[in-house]
Amino acid sequence: MESSIEKLEGLAHKLTVEIPAGDIDQAVTQRLKSLRPRLRIDGFRPGKVPPHIIKQRYGISARQDVLGDEIDRSYREIISKSDYAPVAPPQIELISGFKEGEALKFEAIFEVMPEVVVNGLDALDITLPDAQLSDKDVDEMIDTLRRQRANFVESDKIAGNGDRLTLDFIGTLNGEPFEGGKGEDFCFNLGSGQMLPDFERGLQGMKAGEEKSFDVQFPEDYPSENLAGKTAQFAATLKKVEAMILPEVDESFIKAFGIASGDAADFRRAIRDNMSRELEKAKRRIKRERLFDAILEKNADQIVPNASLHQEMERMAKEFNLEKQIPDTEKRHQLMHQLFEKNAKRRIQLGLLLGKLFDERQIEIDQSRVQERLESIAATYEDPEEVKKWYQNDEKSRRDLEAVILEEQLIDQLYEKAKVSYETRSFQEIMAVNAQIHG
């Protein structure tokens, strides 16, 4: 057997292997001989089928099996004796070996892990948002809960924020209707942000029974390419306006949220405690993402294996059920690159950089932090002790929690050398920033 490995562009390498024809033909002959005792062919006694008949019937498939086995065996053997560590199965191209008397020759293209060097850790400049929970924030949260349990009553009032509207509409672009631009008995809450800003503004001040036409500007990043950045014309008929009737914050309302006492002070305390937990969780997440963004900015040229990038995009596409939505393979792959390539590359780069930092620093898990986080998680459930017991008995959940804490310990170490400044934000602003973080 002869072999050679050639470096290609980026992280790719090409392994070329040639196995003599005699070795392949001998393996095929042995494969056919092994079939003889088990064959049942009309006109021949079991185990007595002539070799030339076996070869006529099974020669091609036997050769295919041998080629597959030899390619797999030789590839594994050569790679195991080399210094290469492929990141994914190779792409195989069979050059020769299809015919009897022909040597098996194939090429295997594979990628290796890139060299990882983390730069710029002493020059990280990060701005973090900060907020203190106020009584006003608690009041606004209670109002949000009231709106979630609101009733709606049909009214002859003019449409305003908070009202539930029922309407028919049709949109046109350059005088032509477009897909998704038509609705009948469409219902939504005005001011909720469910529709584009121009669409909601166009309905403000209308009364049931009125018709109105208005322009709607689509944003540049709108998912539909034929609408992105363009202005469409909409004609709307408002069929019904329903005014929002908020419930009183009374004993029955409070008990509906699990506060057994029905007491307003207990209710506010529970709301504040939950908001405090959510605020701290959001601040931790933002702190994490800002650090990762800063590290990636300093290491933007970190190369990633194409195989890993493709695998991550495929995984993300599966999460979005893209195969079922777009059966056409070519179109799906094009959309997959448009939607996921940037985030997939970011995830892989980050994984390589963080993996390197973990290897270098060998951080030991702080079990007191694990226990503290477990207490915090358990406190959000009706039976905290049962939750803690479940984490202690479920190995995977415990490992996942420890992985989060270990990452936070690394983050704390990296922040020790970073230049950090803070900007005052409201609770709502921090929650909005947190909501924009992907994955």
Curated annotation (Swiss-Prot):
Cited function: Involved in protein export. Acts as a chaperone by maintaining the newly synthesized protein in an open conformation. Functions as a peptidyl-prolyl cis-trans isomerase.
Main location: cytoplasm
Biological processes annotated in GO: 'de novo' cotranslational protein folding; cell division; chaperone-mediated protein folding; protein transport; protein unfolding
Protein name: Trigger factor
Gene Ontology molecular function: peptidyl-prolyl cis-trans isomerase activity; protein folding chaperone; ribosome binding
UniProt superkingdom: Bacteria
Family designation: Belongs to the FKBP-type PPIase family. Tig subfamily.
Keywords per UniProt: Cell cycle, Cell division, Chaperone, Cytoplasm, Isomerase, Rotamase
PPIase FKBP-type domain ranges (all copies): 162-247
Cystine bridges: none
Protein's cellular compartments: Cytoplasm
Record's catalysed reaction(s): [protein]-peptidylproline (omega=180) = [protein]-peptidylproline (omega=0)
E.C. designation(s): 5.2.1.8
Annotated HAMAP family: Trigger_factor_Tig
Domain notes: Consists of 3 domains; the N-terminus binds the ribosome, the middle domain has PPIase activity, while the C-terminus has intrinsic chaperone activity on its own.
Listed GO CC annotations: cytoplasm
